[in-house]
Amino acid sequence: MLPAPLRGAATLLAVLALAALLTTVRHNASAYLTGVWDTGSQTLVYGRIHQMEQGQYAPGGFLGVYTDDWSDDTNRALFRDDTPTDAAAFHPYTHQSGLQGWLFGRVNRLLRHRLPDGLARETALYWLNSTLFYAAELLVALAVWEEFGPLAAAFGFASVLLAPWLQRGMKDLYWCLWTWLLPLLAALWLCHCTRVRGKTPRGCWPLVAAACMVRCMCGFEFITTFLILCEIPLCYAAAKAYFVRRDPHGALVWLGRTVGAGVSALGGVTAA
């Protein structure tokens, strides 16, 4: 049997490979075949990517647009056609940090060396976003498998494959649906490490904070939902300790960890 670190690395590689395969086979990177939604918000990311593409900078590094109307497709066209723009025309969107704009802007600049065509780079960014979402969902499915068995994991992941909203939305460069799952994944990892080691490693608390911070830096929308997702695995562990194992003390310990995770999550939100 492989050592635990090697097993973990092999599992992660397998998850990424399967996620990439699903993105390719199900055409999630194609706006034509699987559609898009909420193009108005995505415009902010296209504006930021194009700003970085032009070598322009604005204080704060926020998302933004080069037009007064966010609802049209102009900023996307500016990016895809590599149209020269006036730096003074950029209107920053300062309601969030805009981490996704910086991330995709960096990736786009790397892609330019191999993909000079704007449409090809857009498809590559969609492919990356969708692959990360599938990878996050597969990791959740593995956690469900470990606790409830393969049938529950299969049904759960099938709901992702069959959900039109997710199939269309996972490519969206503004919403970045994979970041919605980061707080849940951090909490699941905390629970896993605690069960394996018998105590919670100190590094799990800043991991929870970092997961919430990254999500909030991509937008504060639905933050209460993400915080609830972060607490669900720990609340389940507390309930299992009390009702299944008949261990009131163990349940209290898990409730304490739930509070700790909540404090860490709020710290991440505040930092964002």
Language-model features: locations:
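Transmembrane-helix motifs of polytopic, lipid-linked glycan transferases
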Residues: 123-152
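Short hydrophobic/aromatic helix or loop-helix immediately within or flanking a transmembrane segment
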Residues: 79-123
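Membrane-interface alpha helices of multi-pass inner-membrane proteins
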Residues: 203-222, 226, 261-267
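Aromatic- and kink-enriched transmembrane "portal" helix at the membrane-lumen/periplasm boundary
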Residues: 118-126, 156-182, 212-217
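Transmembrane-embedded, aromatic-rich helix segments that form part
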Residues: 221-237
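Membrane-interface transmembrane helices that cradle and orient dolichyl/undecaprenyl
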Residues: 186-203, 237-241
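Hydrophobic alpha-helical membrane-interfacial segments at the cytosolic entry of transmembrane helices
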Residues: 249-272
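Start-transfer (signal-anchor) and selected internal transmembrane alpha helices
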Residues: 1-24
